[in-house]
């Protein structure tokens, strides 16, 4: 039987009193388990934290649901669609709070047409927004979009700008 993670009582007490940081920390701890019941608890605590406005919990839920939906896509398209819907909901919530990685993930929904109408212009707009908020991968994606005229006119100057900006952001991350 898979072993459950050690959960500090103080953390549970904080989470139970409505501390969203503690709730999200609990979710992350439970998610490290291989026990199915603990995975369910992880989701429950993350949902509580997200409901209280915890932006990282919102993003975490969106990413988790999207990952699960992709795994289900072949064997159960209807169930996958449900989970893509959950993912879209939470990524949209996190994006509304300016979470750059959530915005970039949301762009993918519009690019692929997952539970939303395919909208390349909206996808590019979201990639740009994430890039402007400092998301290095979004900067790289935007540079690629400009280089290859993917849904917009090619623009070598903008492509170079976004490549350079991504390099600078990544260099700062390396130095930290």
What are the roles of these predicted feature ranges?
Residues 2-9, 36-45, 71-90, 117-126, ...:
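Structural signature of tandem alpha-helical TPR/SEL1-like repeats
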Residues 8, 12, 20-24, 28, ...:
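Alpha-helical tetratricopeptide repeat
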Residues 12-14, 48-49, 92-94, 129-130, ...:
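Canonical positions in the second alpha-helix
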Residues 17-19, 32-33, 52-55, 68, ...:
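Short helix-capping/linker turns of helical repeat alpha-solenoids
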Residues 25-32, 60-74, 103-112, 144-148:
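Hydrophobic face of amphipathic alpha-helices that form TPR/SEL1-like repeat modules
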Residues 141-144, 148, 172-176:
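TPR/TPR-like alpha-solenoid helical repeat scaffolds
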């Amino acid at each position: 039987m898979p072993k459950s993670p050690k959960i500090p009582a103080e953390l549970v007490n904080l989470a139970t009193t409505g501390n969203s940081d503690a709730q999200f920390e609990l979710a992350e701890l439970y998610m490290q388990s291989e026990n199915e019941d603990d995975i369910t608890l992880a989701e429950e605590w993350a949902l509580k934290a997200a409901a209280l406005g915890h932006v990282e919990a919102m993003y975490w839920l969106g990413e988790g649901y999207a990952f699960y939906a992709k795994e289900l896509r072949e064997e159960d398209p209807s169930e996958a669609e449900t989970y893509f819907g959950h993912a879209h909901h939470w990524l949209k919530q996190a994006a509304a709070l300016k979470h750059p990685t959530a915005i970039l993930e949301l762009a993918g929904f519009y690019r692929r047409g997952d539970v939303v109408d395919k909208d390349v212009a909206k996808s590019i707009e979201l990639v740009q927004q994430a890039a402007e908020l400092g998301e290095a991968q979004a900067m790289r994606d935007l540079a690629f979009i400009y280089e290859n005229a993917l849904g917009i006119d090619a623009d070598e100057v903008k492509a170079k700008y976004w490549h350079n900006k991504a390099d600078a952001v990544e260099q700062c991350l390396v130095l930290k």
